Structures are given as C-alpha cells and as structure tokens.
C-alpha cells in the first residue's frame, strides 16, 4: 500500500500558486518532467500523478494550503473544474455540492 501523501512531501515535489491554482514541478520525477513544468493533465478535472498515485489537483491544493486532506467534497465556486485557485475552492457536503450543479439544457 502506498504511503499517505503529506503536506510536507507535497511541498517538496510541487509548488502551488493559490492565485492561479497552477501546480508546477520542483523536482524531476521522470524523463518527461522538467523543473518548472506545469503539473497535471486535463480531463473532467485536473489530475496529477504523484508517487505512483493519481490525485485530483483541487484536493492537492487543499492539502497544500491547509495541511490536511479535505474531509468533505471540494466544490468549485465558479463551476469551472479546471480553476483550482484557492479562492475558488470550498469544502462542502455532498448535498451542498449538488446545489451547484447547473440546469440541464435538454
């Protein structure tokens, strides 16, 4: 089983800009990664592979900023799942998060 990622370890490997929500590499983790490169790839959310595990960037942002893993869901205030700026993230219950789902257009 993989060792749980800590804030200390996260900060050794990645830099997080709370204003832009962008993570960049502080160390080379593979031949394809250069120091200063933007970390992660875009899907439904931004994902970052770190220490053999795949993480959602918004959850890493929470750990980076507050030192603990979120105990609830993380909601993006503006509904943009790629905007991981700290001001755009809030910890919510599942039911609170459902209120932020847009109305279907069909």
Language model regions located:
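Short helix-coil boundary/hinge micro-motifs
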Residues: 1-50, 54, 103-104
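Short, cationic Gly/His-enriched loop motifs
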Residues: 13, 18, 49-106
């Amino acid at each position: 089983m993989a060792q749980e990622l800590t804030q200390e370890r996260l900060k050794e490997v990645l830099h997080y800009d709370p204003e832009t929500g962008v993570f960049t590499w502080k160390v080379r983790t593979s031949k394809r990664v250069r120091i200063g490169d933007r970390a992660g790839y875009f899907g439904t959310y931004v994902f970052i592979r770190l220490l053999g595990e795949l993480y959602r960037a918004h959850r890493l942002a929470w750990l980076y900023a507050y030192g603990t893993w979120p105990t609830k869901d993380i909601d993006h205030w503006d509904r943009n799942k790629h905007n991981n700026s700290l001001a755009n993230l809030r910890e919510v219950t599942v039911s609170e998060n459902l209120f932020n789902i847009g109305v279907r257009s069909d």
